[in-house]
């Protein structure tokens, strides 16, 4: 069953509210095995809502409209559906009962315009709405299924789950199980990931969808099958192929983060960590300590923002700072070594860079970051050049530092 969704409301187009119904609808239809191919947002205009319905019914088997079922003049979804299908609006006893019951239960007077909510296109059935005055609308017409649902999420969500989805079972909704698995990737950009899996992106079942985030790329593998085991098997086969190509960059799955994965390895191997930060201002330590149980492996951190602090607390040589500058591979290495020795850990990480917006030069532009890691005396330095605002550069710096830690742990512990 192929579906399209139309969300009505000028306030969404103006950015005054966020359309959370779209995400909820997508998840629920996917779980029910219904393919949602298109979502559109339309303002509170009769002509445009009708046009959206006309366009959708030429392509889809199921057309869902959210919003526009209230009592005011700009609530136009019932009128638009009736006009699109050439049907009259008639009063529905069940819809009228929904309105009157709502006001009676709250001992509030009902104004006459509320009875507009009892009007349905001829042949439609009302869907009960215990959370509001507007009944939903369910209509089969000329081989298509139409559903009108209220816009407020507290009404939309229960009506979708409790009223609409059960009604769709006789109309060919697939009862397949949908299983998704997410692969988490770092250390390589979105273009590099897509190049590695471009021949797999057109797979129909399972599907493969990349998504880029700052310092990370995710690959979502989604399979449909008659059972959970069969769906898992399909994604597992695809995952094997992807890992053969990108295994050096896949650090986790599903809800894993770099800080949770590296933390688990540190704890399992009884290794300890300390960090020295300059441009990130403590963000790396913050992320590491967000993980429950991090006190088992994280012993401490320092924010050495000034050159004087780097010399005093980390033992960075003044001559190195004078000759190479604070943002240099030599200083990153010295920071990692200094914090490891000062705190007494197995591993030390040092971060130094230019987060901006000022402070950059042609030789050392904004976004230049050096990351150092000292693993029991073995030092490695990584150079990065990030783009974006100050907060984004700081985040990507910590992401790269955690990836460097993950990679070092893999190399040392294999």
Swiss-Prot record:
InterPro entries found in the cross-reference section: CinA, CinA-like_C, CinA_C, CinA_KH, Competence-induced_CinA, MoaB/Mog-like_dom_sf, MoaB/Mog_dom
Domain of life: Bacteria
Protein family (similarity comment): Belongs to the CinA family.
Record's protein name: Putative competence-damage inducible protein
Gene source species: Moorella thermoacetica (strain ATCC 39073 / JCM 9320)
Lineage, opening ranks: Bacteria, Bacillati, Bacillota, Clostridia, Moorellales
Name of the coding gene: cinA
């Amino acid at each position: 069953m192929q579906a399209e969704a139309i969300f009505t409301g000028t306030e969404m187009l103006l950015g005054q509210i966020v359309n959370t119904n779209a995400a909820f609808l997508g998840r629920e239809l996917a779980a029910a095995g219904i393919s949602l191919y298109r979502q559109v947002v339309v303002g509170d205009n009769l002509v445009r809502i009708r046009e959206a319905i006309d366009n959708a019914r030429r392509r889809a088997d199921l057309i869902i409209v959210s919003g526009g079922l209230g009592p005011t003049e700009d609530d136009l979804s019932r009128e638009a559906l009736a006009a699109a299908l050439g049907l009259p609006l008639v009063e529905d006893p069940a819809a009228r009962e929904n309105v009157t019951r709502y006001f009676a239960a709250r001992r509030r007077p009902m104004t006459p315009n509320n009875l507009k909510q009892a009007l349905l296109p001829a042949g439609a059935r009302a869907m009960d709405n215990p959370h509001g005055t507007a009944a939903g609308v369910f209509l089969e017409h000329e081989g298509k299924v139409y559903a009108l649902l209220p816009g407020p999420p507290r009404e939309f969500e229960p009506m979708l789950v409790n009223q609409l989805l059960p009604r769709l079972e006789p109309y060919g909704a697939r009862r397949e199980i949908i299983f998704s698995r997410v692969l988490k990737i770092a250390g390589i950009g979105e273009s590099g990931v897509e190049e590695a899996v471009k021949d797999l992106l057109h797979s129909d079942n399972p599907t493969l969808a990349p998504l880029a985030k700052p310092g990370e790329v995710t690959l979502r593998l989604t399979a449909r099958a008659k059972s959970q085991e069969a769906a898992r098997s399909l994604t597992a086969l695809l995952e094997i192929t992807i890992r053969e190509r990108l295994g050096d960059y896949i650090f986790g799955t599903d809800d894993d983060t770099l800080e949770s994965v590296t933390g688990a390895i540190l704890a399992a191997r009884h290794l300890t960590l300390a960090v020295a930060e300059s441009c990130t201002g403590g963000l790396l330590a913050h992320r590491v300590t967000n993980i429950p149980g991090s006190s088992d492996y994280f012993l401490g951190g320092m924010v050495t923002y000034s050159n004087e602090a780097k010399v005093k607390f980390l033992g960075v040589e003044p001559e190195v700072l004078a000759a190479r500058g604070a943002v240099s591979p030599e200083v990153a290495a010295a920071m990692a070594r200094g914090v490891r020795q000062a705190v007494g850990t197995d591993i030390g990480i040092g971060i130094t860079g230019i987060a901006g917006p000022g402070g950059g030069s042609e030789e050392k532009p904004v976004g230049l970051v050096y990351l150092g890691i000292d693993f029991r005396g073995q030092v490695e330095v990584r150079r990065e050049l990030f783009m974006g605002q100050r907060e984004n550069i700081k985040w990507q710096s910590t992401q790269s530092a955690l990836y460097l830690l993950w990679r070092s742990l893999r190399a040392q512990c294999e």
